């Protein structure tokens, strides 16, 4: 059985050597990002996420990494995000929220720090926020209907959706020039204070996501309905945010 690392750094040397062997001089950098680079990493539960930057010639040789990617997935390493330097820099206006969150917690494992000089236009972030919030609200509603009221499925829907909303909260705080806290609960609390939403609802959702709540079936349903209501309130606010 593949060994799941207790800490991501346990695999840095092995992984770096493997991808250097595969791509050689076409490997520009390997960067760890996400929970593995912060305080939220849980061995066996959290994926380990890497951004691997390649030259144009290297990106055309991804077939060489097929076996390596499959092997690392057995050790909870997510499929790496492979990009060229040009594509990464060109994504600052298309995917600013993803890159903003990536830049919050990362570790350069090998090569150049390709994230250091990335900067984000607040107009681009606001536009993506509006699109993401409204789109995710629609998915929440349709997802709720698909549960047919099954509390286990409602719990799963909360757990699957909350992390994405916390990432959006980070972008919302960035728009208001508010320092983004490190922990999920702290981010939720800060967003609630900054935007007048009920942080307590999202904190209950976080308890459900972590599996530490003691809510009844009716309470879980009530939490979810309040969850959708607060997201709807955020959608109404985003149009009024000046950048």
Task: Outline where the language-model segments fall.
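Short glycine/proline- and acidic residue-enriched helix-loop micro-motifs
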Residues: 1-2, 115
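Active-site palm subdomain of RNA-directed nucleic acid polymerases
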Residues: 23, 27
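Metal-dependent nucleotidyltransferase catalytic core
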Residues: 2-22, 38-45, 51-95
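Conserved nucleotidyltransferase catalytic core and NTase-mimicking acidic/glycine-rich helix/loop elements
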Residues: 12, 119, 123-243
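A generic structural signal for well-ordered alpha-helical segments enriched in polar/charged residues
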Residues: 17-21, 71, 108, 193, ...
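Conserved NTP/Mg2+-binding pocket subregion across the NTase superfamily
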Residues: 62, 66-156
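Short gly/ser-rich loop at a beta-strand->alpha-helix junction or flexible surface loop bordering the NTP-binding
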Residues: 28-36
């Amino acid at each position: 059985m593949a060994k799941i690392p207790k800490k991501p750094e346990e695999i840095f040397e092995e992984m770096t050597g493997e991808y250097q062997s595969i791509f050689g001089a076409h490997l520009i950098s390997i960067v760890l990002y996400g929970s593995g680079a912060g305080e939220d990493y849980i061995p066996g539960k959290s994926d380990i996420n890497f951004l691997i930057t390649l030259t144009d010639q290297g990106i055309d040789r991804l077939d060489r990494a097929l076996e390596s990617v499959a092997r690392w997935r057995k050790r909870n390493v997510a499929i790496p995000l492979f990009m060229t330097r040009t594509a990464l820099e060109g994504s600052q206006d298309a995917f600013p929220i993803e890159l903003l969150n990536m830049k919050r917690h990362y570790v350069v494992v090998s090569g150049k720090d390709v994230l250091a000089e990335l900067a984000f236009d607040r107009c681009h972030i606001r536009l993506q926020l509006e699109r993401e919030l409204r789109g995710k609200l629609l998915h929440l509603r349709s997802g709720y209907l698909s549960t047919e009221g099954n509390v286990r499925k409602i719990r799963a829907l909360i757990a699957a959706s909350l992390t994405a909303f916390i990432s959006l909260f980070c972008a919302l705080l960035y728009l208001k020039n508010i320092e983004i806290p490190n922990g999920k609960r702290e981010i939720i609390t800060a967003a609630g204070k900054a935007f007048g939403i009920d942080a307590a609802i999202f904190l209950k959702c976080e308890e459900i996501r972590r599996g530490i709540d003691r809510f009844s079936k009716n309470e879980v349903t009530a939490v979810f309905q309040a969850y959708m209501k607060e997201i709807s309130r955020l959608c109404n606010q985003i149009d009024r945010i000046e950048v």
